[in-house]
């Protein structure tokens, strides 16, 4: 099975070698790689953070360490050094971001550790949030992966959970158990899974536990079909959850379609997104600059669905002027029901325009400039103006 396909399952897997309870020979190889970024951002108008002009610089270095033992066990670790806002000392962080191990067996593999939850496409709500995972995969059928897993969002007194599985409060346990599979047909990857959510956290020091059970069903497609690049994903949540001090129905539905076509140096694409009943898309979803923190827009409009049930439609064009220079443009329409942005609580229409440029200074060095503007159909909201430039280095 193509090892690159395993990455789409959900994960990059990581635990420290000492946690394996055995000595491992790490003499086979040790690879160190990573990336560094310095960027400046200027924002004016209403944003998810404030309604005044803001100029910031930040920097980030990510270092990956990978090794393979003589017996084929793969160990991965990543350290992130963040200086989120220059001049603000409280935003300086050093984090052991990932730590995982992949143990190959005949027709099986075991994958375990602290990983980024990257199931399917970037639309998945917890995309790149941290989970602690134990994952068993079966690869005995050609071009097919079957798997089962258990992951923790909250364990014991550790109360840092991700956005998909709940707020970062409460002590106790929050577990997810699931079964899934995926198959590669020509150039198209198709996958699906069922996940059971069990929330047994306590907000009052152990006097009362939530004892709620929910689930979600997820399916995705990613790859190429009929000459088109395709990403599609749908997730339906059910069962119950804990909100406002009581059990309530867990109902959320998210749908995503991204289609693109390459014409020599020109690429044209279209994206359609729908979120209902509280579904919030992943943070790495690049539907527009103002909904994608990875594009450097300070999450100005936050994740798609974060301000209310949303329908987002966008058209994108990218053109390679030469091997070093790329330009791109996007126009996006956001329709949000009872939008909570700036405590509005009204239906809101947003029209967004994006323009970007990427220039490859050297083989591993890229300079980016991005500009975004957004206008609202509500007169009491100031239009957004957002500009970002950055240096990105791979090593």
Short names for language-model regions:
Residues 247-291:
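Long, well-ordered mid-to-C-terminal structural blocks that present hydrophobic/aromatic surfaces
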Residues 141-142, 153-170, 199-201, 207-210, ...:
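Gram-negative and organellar
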Residues 2-117, 134-144, 183-188, 192, ...:
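Beta-barrel outer-membrane channel/assembly domains of diderm bacteria
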Residues 146-225:
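Internal metal/ion-chelating core segments
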Residues 198-199, 237-239, 274-278, 334-335:
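Short, catalytically relevant binding-site loops at active-site mouths
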Residues 120-122, 155-158, 200-202, 241-242, ...:
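Extracytoplasmic/secreted cell-surface and envelope-processing proteins
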């Amino acid at each position: 099975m193509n090892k690159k396909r395993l990455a789409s399952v959900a994960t990059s897997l990581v635990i420290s070698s000492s946690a394996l309870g055995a000595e491992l020979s790490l003499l086979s190889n040790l690879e160190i790689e990573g990336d560094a970024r310095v960027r400046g951002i200027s924002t004016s108008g209403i944003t998810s953070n404030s309604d005044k002009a803001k100029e910031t610089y930040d920097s980030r270095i990510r270092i990956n360490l990978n090794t393979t033992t003589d017996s084929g066990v793969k160990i991965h670790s990543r350290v992130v050094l963040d200086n989120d806002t220059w001049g603000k000392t409280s935003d300086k962080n050093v984090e052991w971001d990932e730590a995982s191990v992949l143990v190959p067996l005949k027709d099986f593999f075991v994958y375990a550790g602290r990983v980024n939850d990257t199931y399917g496409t970037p639309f998945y709500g917890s995309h790149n949030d941290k989970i602690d995972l134990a994952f068993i995969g079966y690869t005995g059928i050609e071009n097919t992966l079957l798997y089962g897993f258990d992951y923790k969002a909250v364990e014991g007194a550790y109360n840092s959970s991700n956005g998909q599985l709940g707020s970062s409060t409460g002590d106790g346990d929050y577990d997810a158990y699931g079964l899934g599979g995926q198959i590669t047909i020509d150039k198209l990857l198709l996958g699906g899974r069922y996940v059971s959510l069990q929330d047994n956290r306590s907000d009052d020091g152990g006097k009362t536990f939530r004892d709620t059970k929910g689930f979600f069903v997820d399916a995705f497609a990613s790859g190429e079909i009929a000459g088109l690049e395709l990403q599609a994903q749908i997730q339906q949540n059910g069962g119950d959850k804990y909100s406002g001090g009581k059990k309530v129905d867990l109902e959320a539905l998210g749908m995503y379609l991204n289609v693109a076509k390459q014409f020599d140096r020109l690429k044209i694409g279209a994206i359609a997104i729908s979120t209902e009943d509280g579904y919030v898309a992943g943070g790495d979803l690049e539907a527009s600059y103002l909904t994608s923190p990875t594009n450097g827009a300070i999450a100005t409009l936050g994740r798609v669905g974060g301000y209310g049930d949303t329908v987002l439609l966008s058209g994108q064009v990218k053109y390679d002027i030469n091997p070093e220079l790329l330009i791109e443009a996007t126009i996006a329409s956001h329709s949000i029901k009872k939008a909570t942005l700036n405590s509005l609580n009204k239906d809101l229409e947003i029209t967004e325009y994006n323009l970007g440029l990427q220039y490859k200074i050297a083989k591993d060095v890229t300079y980016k400039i991005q500009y975004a503007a957004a206008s609202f159909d509500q007169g009491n909201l100031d239009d957004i103006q957002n500009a970002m430039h950055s240096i990105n280095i791979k090593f």
